[in-house]
Regions:
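An N-terminal domain-cap segment
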Residues: 1-22
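Short secondary-structure boundary micro-motifs
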Residues: 2-4, 87-88, 138-140, 146
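A generic structural signal for well-ordered alpha-helical segments enriched in polar/charged residues
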Residues: 3, 7, 41, 96-103, ...
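Acidic/histidine-rich alpha-helical segments that form the ligand environment
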Residues: 66-116, 149-160
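Short, contiguous alpha-helical
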Residues: 15-72, 102, 119-174
Length: 174
C-alpha cells in the first residue's frame, strides 16, 4: 500500500459542504475514519507489534483514496474523500478494529502497560502509510513515540475518541 495520494478538488459551495459535515468543518465519516485508523495503528503496531487490520482489501472495500489518518487533508480534500467512501464498509472496518483492540487489551500485562515501544515500531506506521511526511501528519509519530503503552490506552485509544465523538453526535442529533 502507498500512503496518502490526495488530489486537489474544487471548493464546493458552503451549503453543499454542510450536507457532508460532521460539524461545520469536518464530515462525520472522516471523524470515524480518523479515530479508527489511529486506533488500528496504535493498538496493532505499537501495542502488539502486529499487523494493522487495514490493508489493500479494506482500502478497496471502503473505496478510500488515502491509507493514512487524514490529518494532513485540507477541508476540500476531506469533503471529496467523504463523498466517495463506502460508509457501510467503513462501519465494518470500525467494528473489526474495535473487536481486535479488545483482544489486544485483554492480553496486556502490567509490565507491558508500563513499557515504551521501540522506535522501529513507531517508524513502521510511516512505512506502512499510516501517516504521511506532511508536518500535520508526521508529528503523530513523535507524540506516540513518547508514550508508554498505558499512555496510548489513555490518549489515542480513549480520549481521542472522546474528542471527536461529541462533534459527530451533535450532527446526528442536531
Amino acid at each position: 500500500m502507498q500512503g496518502n495520494h490526495n488530489e486537489f478538488v474544487q471548493r464546493e459551495p458552503w451549503d453543499t459542504d454542510l450536507k457532508y459535515a460532521g460539524s461545520k468543518t469536518v464530515p462525520i465519516c472522516w471523524q470515524f475514519w480518523h479515530t479508527y485508523r489511529i486506533e488500528d495503528l496504535v493498538s496493532n503496531i505499537l501495542m502488539a507489534n502486529g499487523h494493522q487490520i487495514f490493508n489493500d482489501e479494506w482500502l478497496k472495500k471502503i473505496n478510500s483514496s488515502i491509507t493514512d489518518t487524514g490529518n494532513a487533508l485540507e477541508l476540500d480534500e476531506v469533503i471529496a474523500w467523504a463523498k466517495d467512501i463506502n460508509v457501510q464498509e467503513l462501519k465494518n472496518y470500525m467494528i473489526a478494529v474495535g473487536k481486535n483492540t479488545r483482544q489486544i487489551l485483554s492480553k496486556l500485562t502490567l509490565e507491558q502497560i508500563k513499557s515504551m515501544v521501540p522506535e522501529e515500531w513507531v517508524m513502521r506506521i510511516l512505512e506502512e502509510g499510516g501517516v504521511t511526511t506532511d508536518f500535520r501528519s508526521v508529528w503523530l509519530l513523535v507524540f506516540w513515540g513518547r508514550l508508554t503503552i498505558g499512555g496510548m490506552i489513555l490518549t489515542p485509544m480513549t480520549s481521542h475518541h472522546m474528542m471527536h465523538l461529541p462533534t459527530s453526535i451533535d450532527k446526528i442529533l442536531g
